């Protein structure tokens, strides 16, 4: 049994709403996003005049669990977030659950790695310029520079902006599988 997340918005309508509503009432999915549009009844279009169409419901969708439907109210998400944030929220929840269930420590570490990166993207950390400047320097073949309030990393090839995840751990912008930790001892 796998966890299922259904993403919704105010523009989710009709059949997509029925899918969301039914899975929610059967407790088979977690609905994440915005309340849906509220169109449960199928309609037929009737031409009244050449420039006027009337849509009339001809049936009613009734959920066997709730004994009702979402007409006019929409499907209320289990987790309400703006539609633009629904994927990030579902992704983070999936990673958290996978990490919690993982019995293999390497697999758990992998899920935690991704989750830490996603959280850092969502809530960027600010590290003061004075601290950042202390990290600038030569580390063997690796060069860390401080430019316009930002740290950059370069070995050979392109230069990467360093994105703070913690005050001492940084991700390389554009490289999700590489991070740098500055080990500070005795204030250095």
What is the meaning of each model-derived region?
Residues 1-129:
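C-terminal "post-core" interaction segments
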Residues 100-188:
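Peripheral terminal and inter-domain segments
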């Amino acid at each position: 049994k796998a966890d299922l997340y259904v993403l919704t918005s105010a523009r989710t309508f009709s059949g997509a709403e029925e899918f969301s509503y039914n899975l929610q009432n059967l407790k088979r999915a977690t609905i994440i996003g915005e309340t849906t549009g509220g169109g449960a009844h199928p309609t037929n279009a009737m031409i009244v005049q050449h420039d006027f169409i009337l849509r009339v419901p001809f049936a009613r969708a009734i959920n066997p669990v709730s004994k009702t439907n979402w007409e006019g109210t929409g499907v209320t998400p289990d987790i309400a977030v703006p539609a633009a944030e629904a994927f990030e929220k579902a992704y983070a929840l999936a990673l958290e659950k996978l990490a919690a269930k993982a019995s293999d420590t390497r697999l758990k570490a992998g899920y935690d790695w991704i989750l830490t990166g996603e959280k850092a993207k969502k809530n960027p950390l600010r590290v003061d310029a004075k601290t950042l400047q202390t990290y600038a320097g030569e580390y063997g073949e690796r060069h860390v520079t401080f430019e316009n309030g930002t740290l950059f990393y370069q070995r050979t090839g392109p230069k990467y902006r360093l994105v703070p995840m913690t005050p001492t751990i940084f991700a390389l912008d554009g490289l999700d599988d590489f991070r740098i930790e500055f080990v500070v001892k005795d204030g250095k």
